[in-house]
């Protein structure tokens, strides 16, 4: 395990900036890669958020979306949202959706973003092992909605 000093040194190599997804404090074309790690589904407007990320990318750069739930059917995504909101309300006694956000992706949403922003998506399918692979079968046997998948999406900005 690295010493505390080593952790501090490593962290000092990266900027720590808080900003809104749709108004990033960076110059046009400043980055080669923009990474949304477990965050894209919190966007209030996926098109606006991705457009802002593309603005910050150099020509030929990539915007990568990781760890955002994907559903083959929009109804499954809506069901997940209902279940999650109900669980939050039971646990905390208040609603969790003060700010509407994307929540999940579908192929249709990704195609719409690609058409609107002239990007091409590359999709990667990570493997999480046997137990993860069995989730859809277990959900079906329990008469539950199909669980989400977590794919990796890479949007290529045109050169």
Question: Could you say what each language-model-derived stretch is?
Answer:
Residues 33-46:
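A short SAM/SAH-binding and catalytic strip from SAM-dependent methyltransferases
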Residues 72, 86-108:
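Acceptor-substrate binding/catalytic loop of class I
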Residues 120-159:
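A C-terminal cap/extension of S-adenosyl-L-methionine-dependent methyltransferases
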């Amino acid at each position: 395990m690295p010493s505390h000093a080593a952790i501090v040194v490593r962290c000092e190599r990266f900027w720590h900036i808080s900003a809104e997804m749709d108004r990033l404090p960076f110059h046009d074309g400043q980055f080669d890669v923009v990474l949304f790690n477990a965050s894209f589904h919190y966007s209030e407007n996926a098109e606006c958020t991705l457009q802002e990320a593309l603005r910050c990318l150099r020509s030929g750069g990539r915007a990568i979306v990781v760890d955002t739930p994907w559903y083959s059917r929009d109804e499954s995504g809506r069901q997940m949202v209902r279940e999650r909101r109900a669980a939050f309300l039971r646990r905390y006694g208040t609603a969790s959706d003060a700010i509407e956000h994307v929540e999940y992706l579908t192929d249709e949403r990704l195609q719409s973003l690609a058409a609107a922003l002239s990007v091409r998506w590359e999709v990667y399918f990570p493997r999480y092992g046997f137990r993860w692979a069995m989730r859809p079968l277990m959900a079906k046997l329990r008469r539950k909605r199909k669980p989400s998948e977590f794919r990796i999406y890479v949007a290529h900005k045109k050169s």
